[in-house]
């Protein structure tokens, strides 16, 4: 993945860097608090059988995000 897309496009084992957050207010703050800031590397670790939620490794922590939240994170591939 070398172009921009959302975090939902990552497959298990793929990594990308956060380019932007497509949300404002409290949700933006929550995402920043868990480490989703510009330039941070994110790895898709595991997708649940139904595809929602998805576990991501963010700054060494394993974080589960719902698909609707992952769709608000713009990433650029590695």
Q: Where do the model's predicted regions map?
A:
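Glycine- and charge-enriched low-complexity intrinsically disordered segments
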Residues: 51, 71-78
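SH3-family beta-barrel domains
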Residues: 1-20, 76
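Amphipathic, hydrophobic secondary-structure cores in small proteins
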Residues: 12-68
